[in-house]
Every structure is written in structure tokens, then in C-alpha cells.
Amino acid sequence: MNKDVDLINSLNDLAKNNTIKYIIETGTHRGLGSTTMLANAFKGSSSLISLNTIEIDYSNYSTAKKNLSHFNFINCCYGCSLDLNEAIAYVKNDEAILNHEKYPEIFIDNAKDPINFYVNELEGKLNESSDSIIKKFVKKLLQPSKNSKIKPQYNLLSKLIKDFYNEEMLIVLDSAGGVGHMEFQITDELMKNEAYYLLLDDTHHLKHFRGYDIIKNRGDFSIINNSDRNGWVLCYHKKTS
């Protein structure tokens, strides 16, 4: 997504032609992808107060803080966008995960056992069949417990939305694959009567295929730009009350 020239141009236009004060992003990683893309688009904005980006991997969070330190308006948040127990329950009961064979055109991680894959990712539990990427993820996740006083926060997406509720916002959802739609649902519920801009990444993935369908078919959303090939949609939700 971060190398898509069409999206970069759309974000530049969004920053230039609007008065967005706050950006909320889920999934910082190391800060060199979508976070830097957003920062570059809005660095000249006279209205932007802060870009708030959420990362649960402590190693990535620490690296991102260094990588993004030259942007004085970026606030790197260490923690999870969701309540952990609610996220695990969601993964275990999500119809699209339980019956993923009904969606052959949608990408899903570890189609042989997606529930355990996503639950392991959220819980930090490992077993002999766990993918090496997940093992590395959990190893990094556990680092701050011994080496730092900082502890992860939870429910950060809801908290940040409530903090900036009455302000002009861009919300960017690009978090863990198994709970992307949960993030969309929370955003949609909290902001159901408010105007805001929304960017979804991975619309051809389990993460956001349902949110994308809602955006295309519900009258309170209007699409600014999208790419089915690269899997993103930038849209506007109008005020409804």
C-alpha cells in the first residue's frame, strides 16, 4: 500500500484540501511503511495536531519510535488496538474464519488452521506447529517485561477515537489479520453519527473484505479512491445526525 502512487496522491490531496486534526493508525510495524507514507502526506498540513499509531510488538514499537523521530507530530503507542480477551473470543467465533472455505477468493493466513493461528498470535502461545514468524513475534513481544518499565495498553483504538471524537479525523485500519473486521466494527459503531475519513488496507484479505463491502453498499460512505488490485480503499463517512 505504501508504494501505491495513486494512494499517495490521494492522501496528499486529502491533506491539502481538508482540515484533518488527528490521524489514528493501527499497525505501525517499524514505521517505514504506511506510517511514513501518512507522515509525508501530512507533514505540511497546518491543521494536523498528531498522528497516533499503535503497535503491539515491543521491538517494532522501539524501532518505529527511532525511525519516526524526525516527525514531531507522531505519537507511537505501545499496545493493542483491542481488548485482548474480546479479540480472542472474536477470532474463535468469526463466521468467516470458521467457514473460510466459503470465501475462496479471500486470502486467509494458514487456511489449514486459521483459528489457532490467529489465537496464538493474540495470546502469545506457542506450540510445535507454530510458524517461525509467530515464534519471533512472541519472543519480541515478551522483551519489555524484563528490560523496560513500559507495559502495553489495551483498547487503544476505542480510547483514541473517544479522545478525538469531536475533531476531524482520518482513521487507518491496518492491524492483525484475524481482527481487522472487529476494528472496523468498533470504528463504525463509535463513529456512526460522525463525519470522518477512513482508509482500509488489505481489502482482498480476511482483514477487511467485509468492511469494504459495507463501504461500497451503504449510503453513509462515499469512496474517494480505491485499488482492488493493491487492496485498499480511502473513503469518507458523512455525518448522519
Label the model's feature ranges.
Residues 1-199, 203-241:
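A short alpha-helical cap/connector motif
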